Swiss-Prot record:
Source organism per UniProt: Hyperthermus butylicus (strain DSM 5456 / JCM 9403 / PLM1-5)
Chain's gene name: rnp1
Keywords: Cytoplasm, Endonuclease, Hydrolase, Nuclease, tRNA processing
Protein task: Part of ribonuclease P, a protein complex that generates mature tRNA molecules by cleaving their 5'-ends.
UniProt-listed Gene3D superfamilies: Ribonuclease P/MRP, subunit p29
Name this polypeptide is given: Ribonuclease P protein component 1
Family stated for the protein in its record: Belongs to the eukaryotic/archaeal RNase P protein component 1 family.
Subcellular location: Cytoplasm
InterPro entries from the UniProt entry: RNase_P/MRP_Rpp29_sf, RNP1, Rof/RNase_P-like, Rpp29/RNP1
Length: 111
């Protein structure tokens, strides 16, 4: 199944370009790179200079670039837990995300 704004929380985030929009650690705001590891409570983002930085999912807001080029804003609480736990907790077709394409913001919900 293709990753979309509707179902991003039901997929592994490894390999997606990510940007930290907000987090409880002010030093991590604006961090951008590729997700190289995902745990129950954190994401490891590799920056352009090769640094690997662990960002807690709780109390964070992330921007992920989908394979098609569009961007989705996801709250850390929506992706908390392992992939199996997320699918079990949220159930199919309950994904929520902000789709941002060409500067346009809209709230998309389904379910």
């Amino acid at each position: 199944m293709k990753r979309t704004a509707w179902n991003i929380v039901f997929h592994s985030l490894i390999g997606l370009r990510a940007r930290v929009l907000a987090t409880s650690d002010p030093g991590l705001r604006g961090l951008e790179g590729v997700v190289v590891e995902e745990t129950r409570h954190s994401l490891v983002v590799e920056t352009r200079d090769g640094r690997r930085v662990r960002v807690l999912k709780a109390n964070s807001i992330f921007l992920f670039q989908l394979p098609g080029g569009s961007w989705v804003v996801v709250r850390g609480e929506e992706i908390a837990g392992s992939l199996a736990e997320r699918v079990k907790r949220l159930g199919r077709l309950k994904g929520v995300g902000w789709l941002v394409r060409a500067g346009e913001k809209r709230r998309y919900t389904r379910g």
